[in-house]
Amino acid sequence: MTNAISITETPNELTTEIDLASPVEIVRLLRQCDAQIYNGWKSEPGLNDQEILERLTRLVEVVTHALKSRGRQRVVISGAGTSGRLAMFTARAFNRLLATRNEPQIFRYLMAGGKAALIKAQEGAEDNPHQGVSDLKTILSDIREGIYIGVTCGFSAPYIAGQLDWALTQPKMMSVLLGFNPVSLARQRPIENWDKTFLEVARAVESSPRGLVLNPLIGPEPITGSTRMKGGSATKWILEAAFAVAFARAFPMTRRSKGCLLGPLRGEKNTDTLRRLLWQYEIAREQTYQQRDAIAQLIVWGGDALLSRRSICYLGRDSFGLLGLIDASECPPTFGATFEDVRGFIEGGWPALLEDDEDLSSHGPQYRIRLTDFGKNTLPSVKSPDLIVGILEDGRGPEVLRLLKDSAAQGARTALLTYERPSGFAAKKSNTLVVTPHLEIHSLIPGVPSYAEFSTKLILNALTTGAHILAGKVYSNRMIDLRLSNSKLYYRILGILRILMGVDEPTADKCVRKSLFDTDSLTEAQSSARISALVERGASAEKLVPKALLLATGQFSHAQACEALRREPIVRKILETHLPKS
């Protein structure tokens, strides 16, 4: 591997002009990029390669043993951002499955920043390895035997590095690192207030007899560094496939249920079973993108909403409503979206989400996520060109359907994403749309509709990514209005300035700091402020990257950059005038 840039931070050569593409072309480009999840990238080992499948089989074996332990072992999945949300999503699904058999619910999840981070990014949370260790020790306070799975797509999150480092010291724990870079490209930069780099920890996992690195190379993201897309999808594939096979081994099935792929395994090898399950995700991808024109229409409507400073709202139930919440939560750090730009609401609110008595609604408006909250607080002001999207696997959900009808009556555009013929909702007017992907198989095993969920994730990611492209938040295939919420994004911002403006890293750093501190002349304290201090200030910074880009041209003072962006809020348009010509 000669490329010194992390694969997850490398621009995808397929999408270098995605910002100039029509909505239909955007969907085609996303379809091509997503094909790399299964088919692989260049000559690197991919998800369908034997060596990766054999490593994944090792995970199946230890999870099978944990499931058979009758509660004496734990499986802990941990991540930051999208990885943490998918950790929760997966643990929730398989604990529900265990509950149907009256088996101990052994799956646990951890997320940098805690439960509040499921909805809103918590600044700097993933940069603290010590907090990661503390959280892991707490969740394993009564049982220190089992499997720890740390998910970090780019092999970069200090929160995960700390947990892996500690887990390796536990004699009865298996430590698994899941991501999509070669170990050699794990982050080597120093971690604040810690004595190791992520690269050192990754190598320790790789060399440990109780360690396992799962890192199929799935290629760069369609939008550079946006690992919520391919990285998130591949994470879902890997965890669900491994856990489903382990479940089938621990609790043998006597028959295959209707609409499910997995049945009695009998003499089938785990590698063959995994290959079959993963292939079905690829089939689901193909069948989802057959809805190209409908997805493109969603992108058009989403772009109209954002350009008019209106909203995209998701209304759903069960795991499909949760996917809407996850997609919405990813937009502020990725695109600099405001709280109101993209919202998610779920039937039952926090109790349905967490399945415990904790309700975070009192934390503030962003955490009021019930459908009744939408009806009470959002619906009264809904109008054209707001886009309200219902997400119902079976097309049934009286409260969601009623809110869609009420929204349409007030002039909003409405859409229903479903996998069955909808009951009580039809696209009879020009402002309504039904998207119905025709999937061959919906579920891995009963109660885990993995393939329909993956299809939903693809469509929601395409909608919000495409809408933000139309709203001018992407230049070439790079985010140009992301928020500075952790050290990973700080280094990504420096990379954006270096590549787009042709400046060196010290100059890029100086422009970011000037933008962040609202000044043309940095003080000594501002020049030497640690990254953690920049992240803390970056939580409330508006147009941080666009201002830094304009400052890097040498043609703007800070005040002039602010005025230029005030006159033209679509970031891409103003940058077109001032970025260096290639």
Show the residue positions of the predicted features.
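Conserved N-terminal alpha-helical segment that immediately precedes and caps sugar-phosphate-binding
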Residues: 1-582
